[in-house]
Regions:
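Cytosolic-facing regulatory segments adjacent to core modules
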Residues: 1-78, 92, 139, 180-187, ...
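Feature marks short, surface-exposed loop/turn motifs that line or immediately flank catalytic pockets
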Residues: 11, 90, 126-129
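Short amphipathic alpha-helical segments
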Residues: 16-18, 95-96, 132-134
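Walker B beta-strand of ABC/ABC-like P-loop ATPase nucleotide-binding domains
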Residues: 82-83
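Walker B catalytic acidic pair
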Residues: 86
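Residues immediately C-terminal
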Residues: 89-92, 154
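Conserved ATPase-coupling elements of RecA-like P-loop NTPase cores
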Residues: 91-99
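Phosphate-binding/switch region of NTP-binding enzymes
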Residues: 103-196
Length: 196
């Protein structure tokens, strides 16, 4: 069972993205209702999502609200993973964005440990890291996020490439090993796949 906190996309759009990925039907076709001949694949994808017990929230904005929902679901029937898309969109009480980000990152880390759930937290990349790539993580609030997370994976597009990217495992607290995984982006499904 899993929860997705979609702080950027509305729930129906996030669901369509998942269905498109699982059914291999272009998002545009699903959005436009042009699904003739694909109904079985779409229904199969919807059934798979239901079997996962996956819920998508698009109306939860603060770390306290996220933690409350996670605790509720964990107590009511178990929970395996939590995904947040994306951490910089979590609203906080402080006027300082970095203090809010630090609090959110630490709370996600505590929640994972205390409730024994895997958390996947997406982050934006800051503009400076795109212009001047370095060994730094290049995420907005990278220091706060890096200190709280067990693993950090960065997607990076090689210079001049539109559809190829690499997943760089920059931090791996549990296993220690780091490295690159070659990937490809499919614009039709908004999907990232392993590059052969």
């Amino acid at each position: 069972k899993g929860l997705i906190f979609s702080l950027e996309d509305p729930q129906p759009i996030k669901a369509i993205k998942l269905i498109a990925n699982l059914s291999d039907v272009m998002q545009k076709k699903i959005l436009m209702g042009n699904i003739a001949g694909f109904e079985d694949r779409i229904e199969e994808a919807e059934d798979k999502i239901k079997s996962w017990g996956l819920l998508i929230y698009d109306d939860v904005r603060t770390i306290d609200e996220i933690m409350l929902k996670v605790k509720k679901h964990k107590l009511q029937g178990g929970l395996d993973f939590v995904a947040v898309d994306y951490i910089q969109k979590i609203q906080g009480d402080d006027t300082n964005d970095y203090k809010n980000l630090r609090r959110a990152a630490l709370a996600m880390d505590d929640m994972a440990k205390d409730l024994q759930v895997t958390t996947v937290t997406l982050s934006q990349v800051n503009n400076e890291s795109v212009r001047n790539p370095s060994d730094l993580m290049g995420m907005k609030g990278a220091g706060e996020i890096e200190s709280a997370m067990d693993a950090v994976l960065r997607l990076k597009r090689p210079k001049g490439e539109n559809y190829y990217l690499d997943a760089e495992l920059l931090k791996n607290r549990i296993f220690g090993e780091t490295g690159n995984i070659p990937l490809a982006f499919s614009k039709f499904y908004t999907r990232i796949e392993r590059r052969i």
